[in-house]
């Protein structure tokens, strides 16, 4: 009887913990595939961390106002498979990013690809929202 109870408690615990794990990785919860954005800016920070790498860009609009944007990417392991390294971006690099914008209109996006000033294109999230 104790074994059955322990198995039931463990199973319920697994089911209850699965929801938050899936929600954390839900692209559509935070980003909108119908809001593609493309912008060029200067890298201010590059975080090569799990579970998702991030980079930040200073982007100047037509009036000269600079806004800092953050872009989420896949995990470093997935990025390595697409040709990235922890040194692919450096503070001061000028890059162009294609991404999907945030649902709430904040200055973040889910990066799809990055093009460096030399013309090299790196895929950041080939399976997201496409």
What do the PLM-derived regions correspond to, one by one?
Residues 1-7:
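Positively charged n-region of N-terminal signal peptides that target proteins for export
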Residues 19-23:
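Sec/Tat signal peptide C-region and signal peptidase I cleavage site
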Residues 41-43:
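Conserved hydrophobic positions within beta-strands
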């Amino acid at each position: 009887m104790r074994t059955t109870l322990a198995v039931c408690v463990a199973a319920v615990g697994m089911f209850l913990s699965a929801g938050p794990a899936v929600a954390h990785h839900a692209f559509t919860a935070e980003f909108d595939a119908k809001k593609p954005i493309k912008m060029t800016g200067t890298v201010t920070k590059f975080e090569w961390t799990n579970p998702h790498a991030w980079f930040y860009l200073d982007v100047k609009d037509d009036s000269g106002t600079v806004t800092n944007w953050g872009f989420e990417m896949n995990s470093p392991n997935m990025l390595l498979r697409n040709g990235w390294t922890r040194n692919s971006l450096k503070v001061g690099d000028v890059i162009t990013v294609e991404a999907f914008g945030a649902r709430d209109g904040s200055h973040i996006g889910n990066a799809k690809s990055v093009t460096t000033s030399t013309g090299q294109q790196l895929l950041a999230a080939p399976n997201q929202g496409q």
